UniProtKB/Swiss-Prot annotation:
It holds the Pfam family IGPS. This is Indole-3-glycerol phosphate synthase. It catalyses: 1-(2-carboxyphenylamino)-1-deoxy-D-ribulose 5-phosphate + H(+) = (1S,2R)-1-C-(indol-3-yl)glycerol 3-phosphate + CO2 + H2O. It is an enzyme of class 4 (lyase). The gene is trpC. Pathway: Amino-acid biosynthesis; L-tryptophan biosynthesis; L-tryptophan from chorismate: step 4/5. The lineage of its organism: Bacteria, Pseudomonadati, Pseudomonadota, Betaproteobacteria, Burkholderiales. Its EC number is 4.1.1.48. The keyword NADP does not apply.
Amino acid sequence: MSDILDRIIAVKREEIAAAMRSAPLEALKLEASARDLRDFVGALRAKQAAGHAAVIAEVKKASPSKGVLREHFVPADIARSYAAHGAACLSVLTDEQFFQGSVRYLEEARAACTLPVLRKDFIVDAYQILEARAMGADAILLIAAALDTPLMQDLEAYAHSLGLAVLVEVHDRDEMEQALTLKTPLLGINNRNLRTFETSIQTTLDMLDMIPPERIVVTESGILSRTDVDTMRAANVNAFLVGEAFMRADQPGEELARMFF
């Protein structure tokens, strides 16, 4: 099937092969060991414990479905703005070909504030997880639509062995069953179908009955207004990953505060 996700995964495999030739595992391990870690899960739980929305604020220049979201794109400034206006964590796109992201953007955003940072990319190999640790990420994303269950479990175990938090992302009930076999407390429900890029926030609401109370539900994509936030919080969904709404605003941090606080 030649859909968007399959094309992205094919490119990832080519990128991994090239990266492994230029930066062998042992070199990456040395870089990773020199990096400190910030508590991604703890930051989300702290916001929730205080009765606030736990916002993972995204640093994203573009997307395949929407094109360029922000022309004036300075990751350090965006990160500082998010931190000043109540974000719990950051998410930074590192995919170059499809999202115009960069490893450098993650490094710049993390250096500009004290928030924990998620590497937002399409991870299909353990090498990318070590790469994430070496670049300074505190958490990684695993996308159920791109992985079978045994591989997802192996990748999670490797991430945890490096001290990284794992956000597992699903879009339907079958993927949620797959995700619930993992140990991570972070369950992301993507309201956007990665194969068609169609979006509905009802996707999150329709899966809440499957989720044990000890897990943290993170609703992702399509959260564009205070009304969307209120709808989710009324359903006891209190963690959010938001990018587009902030990136399109003149002041991303101020838009975060307007929508959530």
